[in-house]
Amino acid sequence: MDLKTVTGAAVELSDTAFGREFNEALVHQVVTAYLAGARQGTRAQKTRAEVSGGGIKPWRQKGTGRARAGSIRSPIWRGGGRAFAAKPQDWSQKVNRKMYRGAMQCILAELIRQERLILVEEISVSGPKTKELIAKLGELNASRALIVTKEVDENLYLAARNIPHVNVLDTSEVDPVSLIAFDKVIMTVEAAKQFEEALA
């Protein structure tokens, strides 16, 4: 597959890594699993059995005119236990390496088809200057963008840190969610070659 950088230089990338047909079910499964794995799973609530108190019947069964009640810790009472109490649980899902690789291939190929992937020879700033990076993003028409480089340049990272909807990652940090979360993905040729090597 032949692609062009912003300056018009031709870049040849493998069809396996960047030309795969989009598989929505696969991408959905991998993204869902990734988001599930990010959940803390530490939520804990008490059932009526675990809430303190409520051992005695609050009033007799008949003759008071009130609705019958057996415990002040019933789920319908204020201060009662939860009917279906949440407990700590592990939300992580298993994703095979082959599935993960396939989802990444699908997403990268779809970014190219939708013209959301911008290839550049390099992207850098002279110092940690946000204004300079905003100007460069303006030239590329990418105000909400993920910048992917082979290795994160500290100046670039610091310059992007204060811009909303802009993030800088190196190839080892990129995941399916980060790729689809931005309108545009600005990728250096070096980073694209590294993805080609990892995904081909």
Curated annotation (Swiss-Prot):
Signal peptide boundaries: none
GO molecular function: rRNA binding; structural constituent of ribosome
Keyword Nuclease applies: no
Keyword flag Magnesium: no
Annotated spans, Disordered: 45-64
Swiss-Prot/TrEMBL keywords: Ribonucleoprotein, Ribosomal protein, RNA-binding, rRNA-binding
Gene Ontology CC terms: ribonucleoprotein complex; ribosome
Coiled-coil features, chain-numbered ranges: none
GO biological process, one term: translation
A Pfam entry, by short name: Ribosomal_L4
InterPro entries according to UniProt: Ribosomal_uL4, Ribosomal_uL4-like, Ribosomal_uL4_dom_sf
UniProt family annotation: Belongs to the universal ribosomal protein uL4 family.
Role of this protein: One of the primary rRNA binding proteins, this protein initially binds near the 5'-end of the 23S rRNA. It is important during the early stages of 50S assembly. It makes multiple contacts with different domains of the 23S rRNA in the assembled 50S subunit and ribosome.
PANTHER family: 50S RIBOSOMAL PROTEIN L4, LARGE RIBOSOMAL SUBUNIT PROTEIN UL4M
Subunit field text: Part of the 50S ribosomal subunit.
Protein known as: Large ribosomal subunit protein uL4
Originating species: Psychrobacter cryohalolentis (strain ATCC BAA-1226 / DSM 17306 / VKM B-2378 / K5)
